[in-house]
Amino acid sequence: MSDYKFTLNLPETEFPMRGNLANREPEMLERWTKDGLYQQIRDSRIGRTPFILHDGPPYANGSIHIGHSVNKILKDIIVKSKTMSGFDAPYVPGWDCHGLPIELKVEQKVGKPGQKISAAEFREECRKYAAEQVNGQREDFIRLGVLGDWQNPYLTMDFSTEANIVRSLSKVIESGHLHKGVKPVHWCTDCGSALAEAEVEYEDKTSPAIDVAFVAADSKAVAAKFGVSDYSHPVSMVIWTTTPWTLPANRALSLSPELDYSLVEFEKDGVTQALILAEVLVESCLTRYNVESHTVLGSAKGAAFELVRFNHPFLDFDVPAILGDHVTTDAGTGIVHTAPGHGQDDFVVGQKYGLEVANPVGDNGVYKPDTEYFAGQHVFKANDNVVALLREKSALLNHVAYRHSYPHCWRHKTPIIFRATPQWFISMDNHGLRTQALKEIEQTQWIPDWGQSRIEKMVENRPDWCISRQRTWGVPITLFVNRETEELHPDSVSLMERVASRIEQQGIQAWWDLDAAELLGDEAEQYRKVTDTLDVWFDSGSTFSSVVAARPEFHGHGVDLYLEGSDQHRGWFMSSLMISTAMNGKAPYKQVLTHGFTVDGKGRKMSKSIGNVIAPQTVTNKLGADILRLWVAATDYSGEMTVSDEILNRSADAYRRIRNTARFLLANLNGFEPAKDLVAVEDMVALDRWVVRRAAALQQEIIEAYEQYNFHIVTQKLMQFCSVELGSFYLDIIKDRQYTAKQEGHARRSCQSALYLISEAMVRWIAPILSFTADEVWQLLPGERDAYVFTQEWYQGLKSVTLATDLSDDYWQQLLTVRNEVNKVIEQARRDKRIGGSLEAEVTLFADAALTEQLTHIGDELRFVLLTSEAKVLPLADATSEAVETELASLKLLVASSTAEKCERCWHHREEVGTIEAHPTLCTRCVTNIEGDGEVRLFA
């Protein structure tokens, strides 16, 4: 055999079977960086149609988690596939760099601004900290194989971006959308300042829980809504609250529109009255009020009482009943005391009804001098006095001490209050922002499509946007306000441009360093500088203008796609929509794609306490980034994305299937030079032409799936092709021809040409997803080529050629089905020890007339398709009793062990082995392939 071994065309490649991705990928990254790969891609697309995916900036704090990885990998797949489709698709990653979490981290290191460190020094420390965080996250993102302008990302703290954020605000102001108002915030009376959510801790506290009656301004009319006519006793709505001190600020009573309310009459202490209570809470309430017997006079929905007036229990005005979604029946009466100046829900519903945002409480937690009854009292100490006054006014139905969870200041560990403070707002309705935003939502493509109704509901119901914050590390609201009238300076827009020019040179500190007289001259004494900073959502929400419109690589082209997690309907998608519509009257994006959150194998959120966190760094260090990328691509991102070690191991198994296919292709292109060896598709063996045709059709399906962002369909089709059409059929069949045919003969070159065309196409199909592996394959493909697959376009060499004499795709599909049936019978014969390998088998196919015509069409080459040494086709009626039935009614099979000698070179059992004097151990075909012109194959 050794003499003939060297006449075989054995596969050979440097492409290793094991990916060893964890070690090899970093080496590839080094080469990508050294070669300036991203710039090579940019250069290859100069002048092409732009496609702009704008990166929603992650927050520059902490390490990246699996959700970050999903997001960046999805973006990278899209950018690479769009580039492959010929677009100029730059990717500029960004980071959100201002805001409270960074302030808190820096506070822990250097103390609060204004105490141990000046505000200017504090901002500089925040800038340094954010830069460190960006550097750490950047390395992790690069490790994932994400290509982008990593050396020149956008940061919201870049001086130029900070300046452009100010310019965006000036355009919003110029369009008339800014107004000043008040909004309740967490307020620490010990700090004398507002607290952000992150500065609030919840501890148990004992508070007075009271039930208070608000008597109807017109009891008879209210009773009539319950179907009770000419009612002569007082009718009251009852609220339950644990903050009696907020009652001076009460401006409404909130009911749930669809909840059933009862009118309940009873007599107590000689007085007959009727109370309005939620139907499901009547019994528990009356038990609290020590009412022994009562009569239900009627029932009505909450919606019936909208804008009906009720008297304040101790102040000389009445308040409306209003409707709110925040009303529940978990506790209390089903009617909520509403003080817009002292609660977020109260404020939101108050905005809807145009209620006064009353704030009788000063910075120090003491009632202001004009507060009737309680002026000069601290709110918590006033609780008892409020209760006493209610008792005196006969409005108190119940009073108990109540233990509950209550917000406390994280620094002082003392209870805090909600308190309305002056803030800056973008109005939703003063200049039609809400209406226009809803129109723009309709013009945008939302993927998945339920995203549209979700953001529509949010826009329909959202209050004005409070854009001001009382923070140190943020872009300043660069306004001058008249000290007497509180009006903006009439030249605010031009003044903001002058400030922006300074910020462009010196950063946001330029605002705090600015002496008003430098810009206002003699007017400086009449105006004060606003010291508030912008909500960080304004920073990121304006990047379509501050970054995309400003950077040259975007060519002034608008954004095509925003892509973030599904929580961003409320976040970045919303803030971007509001700012763009306020500035330009249109949405900042054409498409918005959202992906679900990552959960573990049991559907639980990632949690350190549960111990189910999958860190992307761990995955890349153990399995490699391509495995993580394949998991992301193969998962339907429209819902929750399930990940676990087991799931990632399954991805690794799928990866091996693709890698093994690539290795087979490369190994069998050994010695193939496309420039001289490529066989035209129309001249190929029929089976080769069929597989090229299948690949061409598949390429169209894959491109379409990429276009529709259906990456899980890309991976499904790729796996199907590798496993079934190639792995189980084509590659299996051609091994004999590839290894044993004449090296330079048509039969082999036809096969190699098909493998080459498939390889050229497949390396491009996988490049957006399996980027490292695609690069590895690309470097080993034969023929002259550019340095990187990522600068290429979809392969144009796949031709869907069908000759008149060709067998149809249905024909080959039928042969695949027949072959599967033959394999089952051969496998059983092997288990029964009747044969060894399939080449020891001779198979007789008993087929009906139609199937016989198909099977005999390819003559003796049928045996090559079936991988047997002999294949005979006989009429189905001739089937012997030993013939095995198959799943095809038209086919029965009989397998026997060949009695012919085995060819030493090709291992086929042939009658002529031993009859050729010069080569007694070979078959005629092998002799032809060694010494003659090579065998002729027409079909397989």
Swiss-Prot record:
Amino-acid positions noted as binding Zn(2+) in the UniProt annotation, renumbered to this chain: C903, C906, C923, C926
Motif extent ('HIGH' region): 58-68
Keyword Disulfide bond carried by entry: no
Cofactor note text: Binds 1 zinc ion per subunit.
BP GO terms, sorted: isoleucyl-tRNA aminoacylation
Record: residues binding ATP: K608
Primary location: cytoplasm
Cofactor(s), by name: Zn(2+)
'KMSKS' region, short sequence motif: residues: 605-609
The protein's enzyme class: ligase
Keywords, ordered alphabetically: Aminoacyl-tRNA synthetase, ATP-binding, Cytoplasm, Ligase, Metal-binding, Nucleotide-binding, Protein biosynthesis, Zinc
Molecular functions per Gene Ontology: aminoacyl-tRNA deacylase activity; ATP binding; isoleucine-tRNA ligase activity; tRNA binding; zinc ion binding
Catalytic activity field: tRNA(Ile) + L-isoleucine + ATP = L-isoleucyl-tRNA(Ile) + AMP + diphosphate
Location in the cell: Cytoplasm
Protein's UniProt keywords contain S-adenosyl-L-methionine: no
Enzyme Commission number, as recorded: 6.1.1.5
Entry coiled-coil feature ranges: none
Known function: Catalyzes the attachment of isoleucine to tRNA(Ile). As IleRS can inadvertently accommodate and process structurally similar amino acids such as valine, to avoid such errors it has two additional distinct tRNA(Ile)-dependent editing activities. One activity is designated as 'pretransfer' editing and involves the hydrolysis of activated Val-AMP. The other activity is designated 'posttransfer' editing and involves deacylation of mischarged Val-tRNA(Ile).
Domain comment quoted from the record: IleRS has two distinct active sites: one for aminoacylation and one for editing. The misactivated valine is translocated from the active site to the editing site, which sterically excludes the correctly activated isoleucine. The single editing site contains two valyl binding pockets, one specific for each substrate (Val-AMP or Val-tRNA(Ile)).
Family the entry assigns: Belongs to the class-I aminoacyl-tRNA synthetase family. IleS type 1 subfamily.
Protein name: Isoleucine--tRNA ligase
Lineage: Bacteria, Pseudomonadati, Pseudomonadota, Gammaproteobacteria, Alteromonadales
Gene that specifies this protein: ileS
